[in-house]
């Protein structure tokens, strides 16, 4: 059992109202694309869409020390993988409804909407993503300054 799948199961057990299916297959997509030395810090499950009635777009979202990975295994063949690096990350919006909540990740290119998340998990997701991205952006800025000095 991979670390991403294990953490996805822990999240699902802690927040059972979150809608999510095929966690093992979706987790395998992320594990296939982890870089050597990349550490998985936090994992959660959501639907990658904006429609609360569409419950077949389950994604496993992994926050690593380098980026955010969103993995979805297709039913027949292939998969989808989204990678959001700290330099592409702009903002995070949390929306809470009566049953579920949404996490909206604003990037340079698009808005990534993750829905049907147990409303009790929203604060934990916000804390993990925000704190990690702030730290990684600082590190990314230091790397850019070092490269400029080297030129």
List each model region and its residues.
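Acidic, Ser/Thr- and proline-rich intrinsically disordered linker/docking segments
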Residues: 1-16, 20-22, 29-32, 53-54, ...
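Short glycine-rich, polar/acidic loop-and-turn segments at beta strand-coil junctions
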Residues: 44-48, 67, 74
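The phosphoinositide-binding surface of pleckstrin homology
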Residues: 38-53
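Polybasic phosphoinositide-binding surfaces of eukaryotic membrane-targeting domains
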Residues: 56-70
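Secretory/extracellular carbohydrate-interaction modules
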Residues: 33, 37
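A sequence-composition feature that detects small, non-aromatic residues
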Residues: 8, 46, 59-62, 121-123
